[in-house]
Each structure stands twice: as structure tokens, then as C-alpha cells.
UniProtKB/Swiss-Prot annotation:
GO terms for cellular component: intermediate filament cytoskeleton; mitochondrion. Keywords: Acetylation, Mitochondrion, NADP. NADP(+) binds at residues 74-80, 125, 222. Transmembrane segments: none annotated. Belongs to the short-chain dehydrogenases/reductases (SDR) family. 17-beta-HSD 3 subfamily. Pfam families: adh_short. It is found in: Mitochondrion. It comes from Pongo abelii. This is Inactive hydroxysteroid dehydrogenase-like protein 1. InterPro entries: 17-beta-HSD3-like, NAD(P)-bd_dom_sf, SDR_fam. Interacts with STYXL1. The modification N-acetylalanine is found at residue 2. Residues 2-82 are annotated as: Required for mitochondria translocation.
Length: 330
């Protein structure tokens, strides 16, 4: 009995001495919970403010804000074409850049006839190196370029391990995904700075959020574009230039064509037209956005999840996409 009493007294003394530490830990826990809760609430408020509230009012006058002409690279299909059409629907004249002259002529005529705007084309293969940029610079030098959309990009044929990627494809990813955006900005930015207005939209990818296995070179190139855009915004915001890093997740383009699963999830994987309509409405509002409401939800989950969980999910998804793509080519 004496032993029980002694243990009870010892327990009370220890509990009393630890009480202040327990209270401190409780305060830390309460502070952490409150901080995380406020962050989540603010993130969802930002999502609503960005993707839903602007749609209730009138559309922004992009010509007045930025200028009369927009340049869109990789503009003959997918997000690039849809983005060009959306800008044209708002009255901007469009200069389309791509490597296929026949497709460029068709798209330019469609846009001009549908939206009653001026269009121009520049034939350029961004994978061919530095020599293409002098003709582009000459073609654009007398234009009031208000918006540049860096959309041109190269994707993997399907998700695969780095050593399975051909050397030619790797060079294309570097030249097109990284060099093209950087040099196109170098071409148009001086004119924007001189006029003290302009917007640069660079299309990155949701795969830049965290290391993405089986898309290693592609996701790294898109991470470059994201950081490049954010740094430019800090450099040139004071000069009247708006720079946006656009971070889409999957959109129903030719890049996702082999996957029947992705094309079934239309609310997660919008069409290029739907995506571009939403994305253009964020121009001038958000410097870094996914451009589409369901992609913003995916981005929030990606931000909060640990890296190991992202990698695990990416491996499962990319293995499935590779298997489906290979079965289509078999």
C-alpha cells in the first residue's frame, strides 16, 4: 500500500512539474492548427476570387491595358490556338508562330474570319536553334505587341524513364521548352518597357510543383519557366509589365490523346477552349495561377501533400499512361 501511495505522490509531482510544458505544447498546437486553417480558408477564398467572381462582371479591356497585338507561339492547335482565339474574341490582333506554314495559314484565316481581327503568321521551328530569332525580331519590330503567350513546348511521347528518352527529344525539350520562351521574352520585352505596358504569359505545367518521375526532363524544364516568370515579374512590375506563370494540369490536347481515362474526366481535364476562356480571365489578376478552377484545387492538394506522396501518385499515373500509350501503338 505504501508503494502505491509513493507512486501516486511521485506521479502527482511529475505531472505538476510538467504542467507548464503541456500548456506550452497545447498553445503551440493550437497556433499551428489555427495557422493552417487560416491558410486553407485564404487559399479557397483566393480560388473563388480568381475563378468565379471575375466572371460575374464585365470583361477587362485587354487592348487598353496592354496593347493591340498579341503574339502566340505554338498556336496551331491545343492551348495555343484556343488562347489565340480567346484573345481575338476580345478584339486583339493575333500573330501566330509555329513551324507548319499550312496549318498557320488555316488557323490565321479562321481567326480573322470568325473574330474580324487582323492576323499574321511567322513560320519558325523553335527546335532549330538561335538562327530563327533574328527573323522573328525583324517581323515584330514595328508592331505594338501588348501580349506575348509563350505556349510552344515539347512533351514526352509518353511517360518514360530518363535513359529511354532519345537524345534528339532531350535537345528539343531544352531548345523549345526553355530557350524559346527566354528568347521570345528577350525579343518583345524592350518594346513593352518602352511603352510602359504589356503582359507576358508563359505556360508551365502542374508537373513543376514537385519532382515528377518518368517526366524528369519535361517537369524540370517547366519548373524553369515557372521560376523565370516569377523572377521577371519582380524585375519588371514597376515598369508596367505584368508577367504571369500559367501552370495547367492535364488539358485535353494531343499530348493527352492516348489516355482514354484523362479524356473521360472533363471537369478535371477541360478542353483547350474551356481552359483558355478561364485562363484569359485571370490575366492581370494573378501572377501565378493554374488558369482553371479544378486545376487550382489540384494545385492546392499538391502544395500540401508531402513529396513522397506526390512521387508515389505520379509513378502510378505515369505507369498507367505509358502502358495505355504503348498498347495503342502495338
Amino acid at each position: 500500500m505504501a508503494a502505491v501511495d509513493s507512486f501516486y505522490l511521485l506521479y502527482r509531482e511529475i505531472a505538476r512539474s510538467c504542467n507548464c510544458y503541456m500548456e506550452a505544447l497545447a498553445l503551440v498546437g493550437a497556433w499551428y492548427t489555427a495557422r493552417k486553417s487560416i491558410t486553407v480558408i485564404c487559399d479557397f477564398y483566393s480560388l473563388i476570387r480568381l475563378h468565379f467572381i471575375p466572371r460575374l462582371g464585365s470583361r477587362a479591356d485587354l487592348i487598353k491595358q496592354y496593347g493591340r497585338w498579341a503574339v502566340v507561339s505554338g498556336a496551331t492547335d491545343g492551348i495555343g490556338r484556343a488562347y489565340a482565339e480567346e484573345l481575338a474574341s476580345r478584339g486583339l490582333n493575333i500573330i501566330l508562330i509555329s513551324r507548319n506554314e499550312e496549318k498557320l495559314q488555316v488557323v490565321a484565316k479562321d481567326i480573322a474570319d470568325t473574330y474580324k481581327v487582323e492576323t499574321g503568321i511567322i513560320v519558325a521551328d523553335f527546335s532549330s536553334g538561335r538562327e530563327i530569332y533574328l527573323p522573328i525580331r525583324e517581323a515584330l519590330k514595328d508592331k505594338d505587341i501588348g501580349i506575348l503567350v509563350n505556349n510552344v513546348g515539347v512533351f514526352y511521347p509518353y511517360p518514360q524513364y530518363f535513359t529511354q528518352l532519345s537524345e534528339d527529344k532531350l535537345w528539343d525539350i531544352i531548345n523549345v521548352n526553355i530557350a524559346a520562351a527566354s528568347l521570345m521574352v528577350h525579343v518583345v520585352l524592350p518594346g513593352m518597357v518602352e511603352r510602359k505596358k504589356g503582359a507576358i504569359v508563359t505556360i508551365s505545367s502542374g508537373s513543376c510543383c514537385k519532382p515528377t518521375p518518368q517526366l524528369a526532363a519535361f517537369s524540370a524544364s517547366k519548373a524553369y519557366l515557372d521560376h523565370f516568370s516569377r523572377a521577371l515579374q519582380y524585375e519588371y512590375a514597376s515598369k508596367g509589365i505584368f508577367v504571369q506563370s500559367l501552370i495547367p494540369f492535364y488539358v485535353a490536347t494531343s499530348m493527352t490523346a492516348p489516355s482514354s481515362f484523362l479524356h473521360r474526366c472533363s471537369w478535371l481535364v477541360p478542353s483547350p477552349k474551356v481552359y483558355a476562356h478561364h485562363a484569359v480571365s485571370t490575366l492581370g489578376i494573378s501572377k501565378r495561377t493554374t488558369g482553371y478552377w479544378s486545376h487550382s484545387i489540384q494545385f492546392l492538394f499538391a502544395q500540401y501533400m508531402p513529396e513522397w506522396l506526390w512521387v508515389w501518385g505520379a509513378n502510378i499515373l505515369n505507369r498507367s499512361l505509358r502502358k495505355e500509350a504503348l498498347s495503342c501503338t502495338a
